[in-house]
Structures are given as structure tokens and as C-alpha cells.
Amino acid sequence: MLVAFMGVGLTIAAGLYATAMRRDKERELLFIGHEFRHALEGYNKANGAGQYPLTLEELLKDPRFPSAKRHLRRLYNDPITGKADWALVLQQGRIVGIRSTSAQRPIKQDNFDDDDAGLAKKPRYADWLFTYPHDLFTVPQNADVKR
């Protein structure tokens, strides 16, 4: 009987741990999404050009400047997939945002910051778009191009 109770307790603890880990990964995805959004904003506003990058690597070293101009320190892995397999959100062939490629259902469904209000009630992490500006209208079929 004691062994059965211990087994049930361990099962509950494992479930709670898995949920806590997913919540941590969601927070990390939000942080990384904001980093990319901020980098896209910096690239867009740099030198008054109003352009977006052609590649994510251009956020690491902006080719429009003779010396190193960095808008992003490094290319992050997607914390949900564990890989740098971001789907790019494109307009006119230029990167205006990123999104995860994960089809998993997010735990977080509401109570987002104002800049992330569009993430509410999305059925998949892949539906969480991190664009600059945050409320940029995008054409869905353009969001399927991968890096």
C-alpha cells in the first residue's frame, strides 16, 4: 500500500516538474522573441534606412556599415524545439519577424504584455509571431519560409 502511494506521489511530482519546465521554456521563448523584435527594430531604424534584413546573420553584423554594427549578440536556439530552426516571417523577401516551428500547444494563453497581446489564445507555439513592429500585418503563407 505504501509503495502504491509513493508511486502516485512520484507520478504527480513528475507531472508538476514537466509543467514547470514547459513554463520556463515559454518564458525563454518570449525573452528570445523580444530580443529578435528589438534587433529587427534596431536594424530597421539604423541609419534611417527603414529596411529589414535579408538574413538573420545580418542582425549579427549589419553589412550596411563598414565597422561591426550588431543588433543581436547571437542567433538563439528555439527553446521549445532546442534548435535554431526558426521560421522566418517575410514581407517582400525581407525578414520582419520570426516564429517557432513547434506545433505544441502553449500553456500560456492570456495575460501577455501589450506588445504580445496578439499571442493570446494561439493553439500552437508556431502561431506566436515576433515581428517588428509587434502589430505588423503579415501574410500567413509568407511565414512558412525556414532559415
Task: Describe the function of each predicted region.
Residues L16-D24, L40, N44-N47:
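Short amphipathic alpha-helical interaction patches enriched in hydrophobic/aromatic residues
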Residues G7-L10, G33, R37:
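Hydrophobic faces of stable alpha-helices that mediate helix-helix packing
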Residues R22-G33, A49:
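Membrane-proximal amphipathic alpha-helices
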Residues H38-R147:
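Low-complexity, acidic interaction segments enriched in glycine
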